[in-house]
Amino acid sequence: MRKLFILSVVGLWLALALTACGGDAAEAPAAGASVGDAVAGETLYKQPVIGTASAPGCATCHSLEPNVVVVGPSHAGVATRAGNYLAGVSAENYLRESILNPNAHVVEGFQPGIMYQTYGQELSETEINNLVAFLLTLK
């Protein structure tokens, strides 16, 4: 009887501990949801000029169609590729760094220095977050 009591107490304690540590999977945000507004990011992405110095918009140099190169690589499937380029670097961090420091991760076959270099100074943090959120939807 004592053994049953001890097992019950341990089982109850484990159940409470697991409940306290775990979150509800249904509450997990969608990809990009915690980063920014993907709809606003798409709007910004498609504008021909962006930022305080009227820099070229993303769609000026990047296509959303697979294997279509305008100036830079296609962004079709970029969220998936971004998560696989560097071990230990999330897609979100890879994409953000690629906007803030374009020469940090130059895709094979493309030259460094081609991408506009000062988006980090010309776009607000919110605009960058929104662009990253949109890019994370491109799987």
What do these predicted ranges mean?
Residues 1-10:
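Bacterial N-terminal signal peptides that target proteins for export
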Residues 17-20:
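C-terminal motif of bacterial Sec signal peptides marking the signal peptidase cleavage site
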Residues 22-52, 89:
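Electrostatic cytochrome c docking/interface patches
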Residues 24-27, 68, 137-139:
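Inter-heme linker and motif-flanking segments adjacent to c-type heme-binding CXXCH motifs
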Residues 35, 53-54, 59-100, 117-121:
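Gly/Gly-Pro-rich "capping" loops immediately C-terminal to redox-active cysteine motifs
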Residues 45, 62, 100, 136-139:
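Protein kinase-like catalytic domain
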Residues 93, 114-139:
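C-terminal capping alpha-helices of c-type cytochrome domains
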Residues 105-110:
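Substrate-binding/catalytic groove segments of enzymes
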